[in-house]
């Protein structure tokens, strides 16, 4: 079934929550990363949710990735174009009645999209929405360190807990740093 905008999305989640026990009412929103098709993003998130044995509501925000390794700049433009839609999705989930915790998880370039969206919420005075977030997880975030610091400063108090998972041996992040002229 096709949902009728944010209200239809929220109504569908509230209907799903109505039939669940409280311990299964948490919501995780996953934002995929660079060079990831819709199907790959859904599959990756399904695997993560399965591995974590997450019993709550699983939601996936997909932005247009060009799914080409050489389309890095185009993907960065796409994520910025998608920022308003992610803000709307976060606002919708934050306002959902009957939910438990709301946790946001972003991978790779999706982490920059998430941070930009949180920054936008802060800059537009939507601290009420930020206060509804029960955690943020950035997995292998593909964000320039100085950009991240500026985003975090603009956001102010970051949702807690706030986790960043990265590895010095991550070849994709090293390549990203090389492409974007970061040391």
What is each model feature region?
Residues 1-5, 110:
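Acidic/glycine-enriched edge-of-secondary-structure segments
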Residues 26:
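Alpha/beta-hydrolase fold active-site loops
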Residues 36-41:
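Short substrate-entry loop that stabilizes the transition state in hydrolases
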Residues 32, 115, 139:
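Residues lining the SAM
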Residues 29-33, 107:
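The conserved beta1-alpha1 loop
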Residues 1-2, 11-15, 21-23, 42-46, ...:
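Lipolytic serine-hydrolase domain surface
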Residues 86, 106-110, 114:
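Gly/Ala-rich beta-loop-alpha elbow adjacent to hydrolase catalytic centers
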């Amino acid at each position: 079934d096709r949902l009728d905008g944010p209200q239809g999305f929220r109504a569908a989640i509230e209907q799903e929550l109505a039939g669940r026990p409280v311990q299964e009412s948490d919501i995780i929103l996953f934002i995929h990363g660079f060079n990831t098709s819709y199907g790959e993003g859904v599959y990756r998130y399904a695997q993560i949710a399965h591995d974590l044995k997450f019993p709550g509501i699983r939601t996936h925000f997909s932005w247009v990735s060009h799914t080409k390794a050489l389309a890095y700049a185009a993907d960065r433009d796409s994520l910025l174009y998608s920022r308003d839609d992610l803000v709307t999705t976060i606002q919708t989930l934050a306002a959902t009645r009957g939910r438990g915790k709301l946790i946001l998880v972003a991978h790779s370039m999706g982490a920059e999209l998430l941070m930009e969206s949180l920054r936008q919420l802060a800059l537009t005075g939507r601290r009420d929405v930020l206060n509804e977030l029960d955690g943020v997880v950035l997995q292998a975030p593909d964000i320039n360190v100085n950009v991240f610091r500026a985003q975090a400063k603009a956001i102010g108090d970051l949702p807690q807990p706030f986790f960043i998972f990265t590895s010095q041996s991550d070849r994709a992040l090293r390549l990203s740093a090389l492409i974007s002229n970061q040391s």
